[in-house]
Amino acid sequence: MEKKVIIKKLMLTFVVSLLSLASFAQDANDYFVRGAKVYIESNNENVIEHSNDKILLWGYWKTVNSKEQADFILNLDANFSIFYTINAQAITKDNKIIKRFKSKNSFKSLDANPKRGAVKALFDKEIIPFTHGLY
């Protein structure tokens, strides 16, 4: 009889622990809300500038000038090999990956400016559809 009570208490403790862990877990829905503040970092200043412009035109997020002000960080790694390709991931301020986006290249958008074209392709084909698909 006493054994059953101990088992029930242990099970209850376990369930409460799981519920509390689940309540603290965050996913993309929690970060990618309208009005979220994003800090953009990249190995290329022009990619940062074009991304800021694209986010401003989109009007869904707001860009900030420091990681401390941001809700999340958008890391954009630009590489050139025939076309500009951007590998993107959204990360938390403590460097946990929220979402990795498929890499996009400047060929996809046929823009005269290859960096701007790669940014445009990334946002138009990956980031914006993913974000709007969450809600």
Residues covered by each model-derived region:
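Bacterial N-terminal signal peptides
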Residues: K9-A22
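Structural recognition of the beta-strand scaffold that forms the well-ordered cores
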Residues: K37-I40, N65, N75
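Generic secondary-structure microfeatures
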Residues: S42-N44, D77-A78
